[in-house]
UniProtKB/Swiss-Prot annotation:
It comes from Aspergillus terreus (strain NIH 2624 / FGSC A1156). Residues 253-276 have a biased composition (Polar residues). PROSITE patterns: FBOX, WD_REPEATS_1, WD_REPEATS_2, WD_REPEATS_REGION. It comes from the Eukaryota. Component of the SCF(sconB) E3 ubiquitin ligase complex. Belongs to the WD repeat MET30/SCONB/SCON-2 family. It holds the Pfam family WD40. SMART domains: FBOX, WD40. The lineage of its organism: Eukaryota, Fungi, Dikarya, Ascomycota, Pezizomycotina. InterPro entries: F-box-like_dom_sf (IPR036047), F-box_dom (IPR001810), G-protein_beta_WD-40_rep (IPR020472), SCF_subunit_WD-repeat (IPR051075), WD40/YVTN_repeat-like_dom_sf (IPR015943), WD40_repeat_CS (IPR019775), WD40_repeat_dom_sf (IPR036322), WD40_rpt (IPR001680). The keyword Transcription regulation applies. Component of the SCF(sconB) E3 ubiquitin ligase complex involved in the regulation of sulfur metabolite repression, probably by mediating the inactivation or degradation of the metR transcription factor. Residues 1-37, 249-302 are annotated as: Disordered. Signal peptide: none annotated. This is Probable E3 ubiquitin ligase complex SCF subunit sconB.
């Protein structure tokens, strides 16, 4: 092996193919005036004699052609004491060589005559062995002799060479922190850079953060909000995701390829775990037994285990992708419609969960439907008059009727479990949360039913029919809307009205507390001087603030604004509520100050039905139209028509909403892609 091959291998890490001595003879006709063909054998030997001492001086541990050294090596600390963080001249360069570039360089070198190869190798050897100061001098001399085309070539080459893969060089937790600042478009582009970037950019740590930032809320940076994800999964995965951010192995496989992340989420349901990457969660003995049975049944076959977890769980990037499609469909009104027909009179109330839809009608029946097939599963008979309100969960359905009664049903079997009477007029509104049931009646009262201690109480104060109620068990308060054009906030502990909201000039039909995640910016508020609420005449009720803007109230002080009973750390009621009335308007209120922040205009007649979450408000009115609103800007984003009668009830979900009408039909609009 000659000196050319030795130099190329030691400098660039390549392995040049053997050179044929016969084919390597120089061809004077193929080279320009800058060729090394004029170098004689004597000159080559002289160059060797000049280069060898230089190499032996600066890299004695790699090059010692003059004989092995027996003495103490020279102290190189003085020559190489100043170095940048990316390169140390006294050590081997830590930057990895680019294989395609090195292959091309090798091929180009082999096209030259042997003497030219030897001369170039000498230059490379000198530069490789030189200390930092010498290298700068060599580079300055070379640059001074370069013409403009050569300088342009150097500039283009250096632009790529000085780039470093900082995400791979940094610890994973810092890389995740950086990626969490990117938007979705930038993340997708980052995933195309390399395999390691894809492993980082597609990891659950990054996309879980993206889901938290956008799902069920408006992102302050981009203004986008995505439909609500199942909160249980979001909550249960958060701690495990945070742990993954600190234990991520960059050399491991991409989470988009394997199901490791999904396995950890499933196995995290067990109270004990042998892996430090899996979170612990308290579960009941029965739940633990179920999990153990599942794990034991899957343990013998790892392939089945992977298939099971892949089937049950998806990476957070896939979740975001699905929610993004749904959000886009909401934005542009792309949806499918399904119509449910079966009632013989107007549909007055409805609710849907998963694939179950329950509807109540003036024909005194409740119907249970399968939303996937449109099939009527069963009809519940028992009320003697029209059904005005209903609500169901996994185990029961409670309905209220104009026959003055409340009934509790097993909606899966159609059996009526119990009947409650207590109102002197028809029941036209109800809402239950945990063990508290509130009912609204024609008799102008709100009745509270406590299933835990079997107690009841009446809340009096409205002067006309009470149309709707909402229970908030966190703050132990109840909202009520009435035909007396007011909305009241009641304290369940003191049984007193602590706030009355005035502003509507028509009968208030609906009141809905917005989720606590909802945020309203101060600059979005409208200054409406005539819409300041007042408080009731009950003693101890605090006076509301009448400032013409959204006050910046600290969370700790919000509770105290509702009276002395909230001073001891008791949670405050929901900060924002939405109401609708027969004055054809919808209003957004702040409960802490009692101010109307925004009024929504657009319906031609009274608004009977209302649905709301953190992203949108859906309303149905006497004008037979359904409108979707942005709660922050007040803009009507879309209007749906189709009903031939007034829209009387609305149910709102993450990717669909349902409307009921006096035309005896229920329409479900699905935005799921």
């Amino acid at each position: 092996m000659d000196s050319t091959q030795v130099s190329f291998k030691s400098i660039f890490g390549g392995t040049p193919e053997p050179t044929d001595e016969v084919d390597a003879e120089p061809d004077p006709t193929q080279h320009g005036p800058h060729s090394f063909n004029n170098v004689t054998t004597t000159s080559a030997k002289l160059a060797d004699e000049n280069v060898a001492p230089f190499l032996a001086k600066h890299i004695p541990e790699q090059y010692a052609p003059l004989g092995s050294r027996t003495g103490k090596p020279e102290d190189l600390s003085s020559a190489n004491s100043k170095y940048c963080y990316r390169h140390r001249p006294d050590l081997k360069c830590r930057r990895q060589a680019d294989e395609p570039s090195m292959d091309k360089l090798q091929r180009d070198l082999e096209t030259l005559p042997q003497s030219d190869q030897q001369g170039i190798a000498h230059i490379w050897s000198l530069f490789s062995a030189a200390p930092a100061k010498h290298r700068k001098l060599i580079l300055q001399g070379l640059m001074a002799q370069c013409c403009f085309p050569q300088l342009s070539f150097v500039s283009a080459t250096v632009r790529d060479l000085i780039r470093i893969d900082f995400l791979t060089a940094l610890p994973p937790e810092i890389s995740f922190k950086i990626l969490c600042y990117l938007d979705t478009t930038s993340l997708c582009k980052a995933a195309q850079v390399s395999r390691r970037w894809r492993a980082l950019a597609d990891d659950d740590v990054v996309w879980h953060r993206m889901c938290e930032q956008h799902i069920h809320r408006k992102c302050k940076k981009c203004g986008w909000g995505l439909p609500l994800l199942e909160r249980k999964r979001l909550r249960e995965s958060k701690r495990e995701i945070e742990l993954r951010a600190t234990t991520w192995d960059i050399s491991g496989p991409s989470p988009t390829v394997t199901s490791t992340g999904e396995q950890q989420r499933e196995q995290s349901a067990a109270p004990e775990s042998s892996s430090s990457g899996k979170r612990k969660q308290d579960t009941s003995d029965e739940e633990t037994a179920v999990v153990k049975r599942q794990c034991s049944s899957l343990a013998p076959d790892s392939e089945n285990d992977d298939a099971f977890f892949k089937k049950r769980y998806r990476p957070w990037k896939e979740v975001y992708k699905d929610r993004f499609k749904v959000g886009t469909n909401w934005k542009y009104g792309r949806c499918s419609t399904k119509i449910f027909k079966g009632h013989t009179n107007g549909v007055m109330c409805l609710q849907f969960e998963d694939n179950i839809l329950a509807t109540g009608s003036y024909d005194a029946t409740i119907k249970i439907w399968d939303t996937e097939t449109g099939e009527e599963l069963r009809t519940l008979y028992g009320h003697e008059s029209g059904i005005r309100c209903l609500q169901f969960d996994d185990t029961k359905l409670i309905s209220g009727s104009m026959d003055r009664s409340l009934k509790v049903w097993n909606w899966r079997t159609g059996e009526c479990i119990s009947t409650y009477t207590g109102h002197r007029g028809g029941v036209i509104g109800l809402h239950f949360d945990a063990t508290i049931l509130a009912s609204a009646s024609v008799d102008k009262t709100v009745k509270i039913w406590n299933f835990e201690d079997k107690s009841t109480c009446l809340l009096r104060g409205h002067t006309d029919w009470v149309n709707a109620v909402r229970v908030d068990t966190t703050s132990r308060t109840v909202f009520s809307a009435s035909d007396d054009c007011t909305v009241r906030l009641w304290d369940l502990d003191t049984k007193q009205c602590i706030r009355t909201f005035h502003g509507h000039v028509g009968q208030v039909q609906q009141v809905i507390p917005l989720p606590r995640e909802f945020e309203f910016e101060e600059h979005d508020a409208e200054c409406e001087n005539d819409n300041v609420s007042t408080v009731s005449d009950d003693p101890g009720s605090p006076a509301p603030q009448t400032t013409f803007g959204v006050s910046s109230i600290e969370p700790a002080s919000q509770s105290s604004m509702f009276g002395p009973s909230f001073d001891n750390g008791r949670p405050a009621p929901p900060r924002y509520i939405v109401t609708s009335a027969l004055d054809s308007t919808i209003r957004l209120w702040e409960t802490t100050t009692g101010r109307c922040l925004r009024t929504f205009f657009g319906h031609l007649e009274g608004v009977w039905a209302l649905g709301a979450d953190t992203l949108r408000i859906v309303s149905g009115a006497e004008d037979r139209m359904v409108k979707i609103w942005d709660p922050r800007t007040g803009k009507c984003e879309r209007t749906f028509t189709g009903h031939s009668g007034p829209v009387t009830c609305i149910g709102l979900g993450d990717s669909r909403f349902a409307t009921g009408s006096e035309d005896c039909e229920v329409r479900m609009y699905s935005f799921q892609s």
